[in-house]
UniProtKB/Swiss-Prot annotation:
Record's protein name: 1-(5-phosphoribosyl)-5-[(5-phosphoribosylamino)methylideneamino] imidazole-4-carboxamide isomerase
Keyword Isomerase: yes
EC number(s) on file: 5.3.1.16
Similarity comment text for this entry: Belongs to the HisA/HisF family.
Lineage: Bacteria, Pseudomonadati, Chlorobiota, Chlorobiia, Chlorobiales
Gene Ontology MF terms: 1-(5-phosphoribosyl)-5-[(5-phosphoribosylamino)methylideneamino]imidazole-4-carboxamide isomerase activity
Length: 262
């Protein structure tokens, strides 16, 4: 089970929302790239980044902040939020983003998904399904798609998608525990690779999700539980480290440049 830390960006800052409510935000750091370095130092293998502003406007509002994260780290970054055209996807992939997450556009313009899969392949293009009571929601969770979550997944599967990021909106940002039953029901019907998201409280939730690995649930995105240090290992890190330095260079681009120069 791969643990994927989440970084949500709103107004250029690293924030967390509760159930996707833009009026219930908590700012954790002014610089998202600083948060990315912290997660990298805590052994993250992949980081999930969302441009919350773009999810509403459809424009890459925090592109520069995302590029800064990509330039800083030496691990893959996936980005979601407001990616609604082929140009949007290309712009992110061109700066080194590992893969992009298509959300609202999968409902409003499903042919875009086929186009992107054909050009970049299924490793670079995944679909995010954010569900409330089994119905997929779009446009920053402000609109209903009128489609059942698993039906949308099967449609995307027919278009070549291999992975779904499945978020239980009713749990997201609440620390009330992962939506085990909803995730299980979705996984049973979708029969795809699935990254679970929403509501993770602690290690007991990870143990539950591990029981779904045979259904394709092989990874989980964790936000607030990591920010609020709900895992014992995080407390140990702080006990043995006087401070977390943010000056270490993780830049893949600079490492390559130094290698060539040497």
């Amino acid at each position: 089970m791969l643990i994927i830390p989440a970084i949500d960006i709103k107004g250029g800052k690293c924030v967390r929302l509760t159930r996707g409510d833009f009026e219930q935000e908590k700012i954790y750091l002014d610089e998202p790239s600083d948060m990315a370095i912290i997660w990298r130092k805590q052994n993250a293998k992949l980081i999930h980044v969302v441009d919350l502003d773009a999810a509403l406007t459809g424009k890459p509002e925090n592109f520069d902040k995302i590029k800064q994260i990509v330039d800083t780290l030496d691990i893959p970054i996936e980005i979601g939020g407001g990616i609604r055209t082929a140009e949007d996807a290309a712009r992110y992939l061109d700066i080194g983003v590992y893969r992009v997450v298509i959300g609202s556009a999968a409902v409003k313009n499903p042919s875009l998904v086929s186009q992107l899969i054909e050009k970049y392949g299924p490793r670079k293009i995944v679909v995010g399904i954010d569900a409330e009571d089994g119905i997929a929601k779009i446009s920053g969770w402000t609109e209903s798609s009128q489609k059942k979550d698993y039906e949308l997944a099967l449609e995307m599967k027919d278009r070549g998608v291999e992975r779904i990021i499945y978020t239980d909106i009713t749990r997201d940002g609440t620390l009330e525990g992962v939506g085990y039953e909803t995730t299980k029901a979705f996984a049973e019907k979708a029969q795809m690779r699935i990254t679970a998201s929403g509501g993770v409280f602690g290690k007991q939730d990870l143990s539950k999700l591990c029981k779904l690995e045979h259904l394709g649930v092989d990874s989980v995105i964790i936000g607030k539980a990591l920010y609020e240090e709900r895992f014992p290992c995080q407390k140990l890190w702080h006990l043995f480290e006087e401070s977390i330095s943010l000056d270490t260079n993780f830049s893949t681009a600079e490492q390559k440049q130094n290698s060539v120069a040497g």
